[in-house]
Amino acid sequence: MMSNLCNRISKKELKKKILMNEESRIVVSFYKYFLIKNTKEYRDRIYQNFYKYNVLGRVYVSDEGINAQISIPVKFYFFVKNFLYNSDLELNNLFINKSLSNHKKAFWVLSVKIKKKIVNDGITNPLFNFKKVGIYIKSRQVNMMLSDRNVIFIDMRNSYEYEIGHFPNAIEIKSQTFREQLKKVIQIMHYAKNKKIVMYCTGGIRCEKASAWMHFNGFKYVYHLKNGILGYVHDANKNGLPILFQGSNFVFDNRMSEKISDKIISFCKQCDKPSDRYVNCNFNLCHLLFIQCKDCTIKFKKCCSKYCMQHL
């Protein structure tokens, strides 16, 4: 039994250790809305077992469920999977979303935190029931609905995610946070309460709750992608269907993005050449997340401006 169930090694040391390790890893994400009565006990159990199997990444636990983005050594993948399936009766059918690209650089540390909610939605209305969700749809239905002019697609991701990749003609709810989006989407889409609406996000957790929120606010025909963009791509590949998502999929780890189509729909902020390459400004007091092509990374030393470059 570990005395302190948290990481005690610096990120710099952990990064060096991971880069020196040659073992293959698989990057996955999963979530499940279900009641967790003792979040502290469940959080510690997750940490102990993930630590044992050298799992890295980010896990949020709350009384409404679990949300995780993690990197697992390939040799331990089925051990971790079986542990999760047996950690609670509600997880015996847990869907684990495999990333489109696996890289050992995705995460350097393991962080398992207790949160008020597994996704910060800002919803305080006690009458809201997040279990009354929209209708799940998979790739075949998605592709059919994309060609229907009477169907509205809504992207429930942040603006910087939308910028490098999205479905054709999908509406962007401009925001930097999910809780801000939920407020805006009701106002912006007020005219469409009787129209078919398809909501999507990266892995499903945000669009699932957003679909319930739309229902709660009087929208009648709400659909959402089963397991998000990742689930759509996997299902389309499995069934030999065309992938209609354009651009790259933003991911919340050190990879920054996963390429889905060859089409680049975004541009370098400094030279305006096509690029989908996100970086954080190299000047620590800035650390701005922005799109920068490889040429400008060299020219500006991975900084967002000449000012930041001069103050390195």
Curated annotation (Swiss-Prot):
Active site: 201
Catalytic EC class: oxidoreductase
Record keywords: Oxidoreductase, tRNA processing
Similarity field: Belongs to the TrhO family.
Descriptive protein name: tRNA uridine(34) hydroxylase
Known function: Catalyzes oxygen-dependent 5-hydroxyuridine (ho5U) modification at position 34 in tRNAs.
KW Cell division (keyword) present: no
This protein's record includes keyword Oxidoreductase: yes
Example of a GO MF term: oxidoreductase activity, acting on paired donors, with incorporation or reduction of molecular oxygen
GO biological process entries: tRNA modification
InterPro entries with a match to the protein in the record: Rhodanese-like_dom, Rhodanese-like_dom_sf, Rhodanese_C, TrhO, TRHO_N
Start and end residues of each Rhodanese domain: 147-237
Catalytic activity line of the entry: uridine(34) in tRNA + AH2 + O2 = 5-hydroxyuridine(34) in tRNA + A + H2O
Gene3D superfamilies in the record: 3.30.70.100, Rhodanese-like domain
Gene: trhO
Parts of the chain that traverse the membrane: none
EC number(s) recorded for this UniProt protein: 1.14.-.-
